[in-house]
Amino acid sequence: MKIKTEPIGSIPRPLELIEGMQAHALGRLDDNGLNKLIDAALADTIKRFEATGSPVITDGEQSKPSFATYPIRGSKQLDPHGVIIPFADGHTRQLPSITGGPFQYQVYANTYLEKAKRLTALPVKQAVIAASALSLLYPQTGIINYSRQQFIQDLLNEAEADIRKSLDSGAYNVQIDFTEARLALKLDPSGGLLQAFIDLNNKVLGRFTEEERKRIGVHSCPGGDHDSTHSADVSYADLLPFLFQLQAGNFYLEYAGEKDKHSVLASIKENMGASQTVFLGVTNVLDPGVETPEEIRDMILEATEIIPVNQFGTTDDCGFSPFADDTSTGRDIAFEKIKARIDGTLLAEKLLNKTTVNLTT
């Protein structure tokens, strides 16, 4: 039996690309110059992904400004002073807010996918941002002649199109980044905000067939930016009863960074559905230390004592650099961790298959 293994998405950008993005934003580098840097980073990312032996790859999100804001890049209807997200180490990230409607994506994720697919024969996975995250773009003060209800309807249509375009463009699967799930419980422990997010995302997922939803997954983590988190103190026992309500086939969960792994596994077993597959993070993206394949093997063997192997897979805890300017994790370290995940998964797979053979002979 094969154990599925997939990356989450982002890979740290080369320093020359980060500097190029900053220069471009200041008007010191033209579009052509930036595109050359992006093309070089993308080609190198795919080459290095292939060298890890990964059966599925991503484009490393080399040209995304961030995992959350790519759809609104270049929009003329933005106020930079939107929702502020605080992290445990004291730094913050701030979303913009929209200033008018109708709300439309400026960029769809399939544009990244199609570019990557031209450079590799391997299956390419595509990450998209959740509708719930983009719902935070609507200002609390409202917008004249553009109600929140109108905005939500436009958002649902655009979020559906973002997923569907990637599926139609040949994505191996599509992963919805839902990192605000845990944060929602921290902000509102009653669960009201998280349930509203779940309901909104299910309105998008409900537009897809059961077969299509087998190729759609959801990623949840406590945030990972500059080696810090925004909601690691929220328990999986509180999160998962909500999360598994989502009408998706695959769930990509931060796990390696969890202190009480036994309780996490118990909560997964209690809440996951029979048709859902859980990919556990087996590399801690906030820790610069590279896991050994043997450590990952042992983590997998422990997990598969609780989670059925046919509903189990491995991944990384989070993207390695969800925001383009994050240099806290080295590019080399990221690929070393991915290689360790691939090798550790294979070690566990061999042992599990050997045990299965022994039990049946």
Model-derived segments and their meaning:
Residues M1-T361:
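Domain-level signal for soluble alpha/beta catalytic cores
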